[in-house]
């Protein structure tokens, strides 16, 4: 009776990318990939800051322009302008590197998502970016000039206004970021409608309340009793809410069609 030596078959290891795509990558592999992508993001940020360092002065000039042609903020401390300069370089560098950093983040998480989730991400990111940039443009070209004109000259007959560059940049960046986030309202409400937190009918019933809120926000941005300026500020916010109602109706309709098909 003859016996044959059987050699056990050795399973070949899958490449990391294929294993990840199939959801078979071990925990250690995920940590290694996360570390690599994080390192790439940090390198991109450092390079972005280095590039932005050479453009910090024009950027500061661009941000002070809404104050008017004769406006020139003061340096109230020895290190004040230097602090503003490096902060602007850091944030501008982050903005320059953000597309690559976002790509690294998406590349890490997308293999774990299903088809619908991937589709949502690739639609949502451009939409969110465009809306935020629209908010920044509205703040810079529409909201800031009249707001700064009032704030900088309020009390000229009583006090001498000396505006520090650091204080000025803080006010301007807060208004820019605030309006950039406010312009994300349609997307946020659309997500809430998709989750069933709000409905188109509920949003429509709160329309009058939002009009009041829009004028309150406009009054905070531009503290004046001029109805024209108030309407210019509040108008886009009201339009954003109407867009939110329309988007929520689309989401609700699609959600109903999916449930009926099941």
Swiss-Prot record:
InterPro entries from the UniProt entry: TatC (IPR002033)
MF terms in GO: proton motive force dependent protein transmembrane transporter activity
Where is region (Disordered) located?
1-26
Keyword Oxidoreductase listed: no
Pfam families per UniProt:
TatC
Record membrane topology? Multi-pass membrane protein
Q: Name one GO biological process term.
A: intracellular protein transmembrane transport
Q: Which UniProt keywords are listed?
A: Cell membrane, Membrane, Protein transport, Translocation, Transmembrane, Transmembrane helix, Transport
Query: What do the Gene Ontology cellular component annotations say?
Result: TAT protein transport complex
The listed locations are: Cell membrane
Q: Which domain of life is it from?
A: Bacteria
Tell me yes or no: is Iron among this UniProt entry's keywords: no
**Chain segments annotated as transmembrane:** 42-62, 90-110, 120-140, 175-195, 209-229, 232-252
Q: NCBIfam families recorded for this chain?
A: tatC (TIGR00945)
Database matches in HAMAP family: TatC
Subunit structure of this chain's protein: Forms a complex with TatA.
UniProt function note: Part of the twin-arginine translocation (Tat) system that transports large folded proteins containing a characteristic twin-arginine motif in their signal peptide across membranes.
Please report which protein family the annotation says this sequence is part of: Belongs to the TatC family.
Query: What name appears for this protein in its UniProt entry?
Result: Sec-independent protein translocase protein TatC
Say which species the protein is native to. Answer: Dehalococcoides mccartyi (strain VS)
Q: Which gene encodes it?
A: tatC
């Amino acid at each position: 009776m003859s016996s044959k030596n059987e050699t056990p078959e050795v399973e070949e290891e899958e490449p990391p990318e294929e294993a990840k795509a199939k959801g078979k990558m071990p925990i250690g592999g995920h940590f290694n990939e996360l570390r690599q992508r994080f390192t790439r993001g940090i390198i991109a940020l450092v390079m972005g800051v280095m590039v932005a360092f050479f453009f910090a002065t024009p950027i500061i000039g661009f941000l002070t322009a809404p104050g008017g042609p004769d406006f020139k903020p003061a340096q109230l401390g020895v290190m004040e302008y230097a602090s503003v300069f490096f902060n602007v370089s850091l944030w501008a560098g982050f903005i320059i590197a953000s597309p690559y950093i976002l790509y690294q983040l998406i590349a890490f998480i997308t293999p774990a998502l299903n088809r619908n989730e991937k589709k949502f991400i690739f639609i949502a990111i451009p939409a969110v970016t465009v809306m935020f940039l629209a908010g920044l443009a509205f703040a810079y070209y529409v909201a800031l000039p009249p707001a700064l004109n009032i704030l900088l000259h309020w009390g000229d007959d009583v006090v001498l206004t000396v505006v520090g560059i650091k204080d000025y940049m803080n006010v301007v960046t807060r208004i820019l970021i605030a309006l950039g986030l406010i312009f994300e309202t349609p997307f946020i409400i659309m997500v809430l409608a998709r989750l069933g937190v709000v409905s188109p009918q509920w949003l429509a019933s709160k329309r009058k309340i939002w009009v009041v809120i829009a004028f309150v926000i406009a009054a905070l941005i531009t503290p004046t009793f001029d109805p024209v300026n108030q309407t210019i500020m509040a108008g886009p916010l009201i339009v954003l809410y109407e867009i939110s109602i329309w988007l929520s109706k689309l989401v609700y309709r699609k959600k109903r069609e999916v449930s009926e098909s099941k």
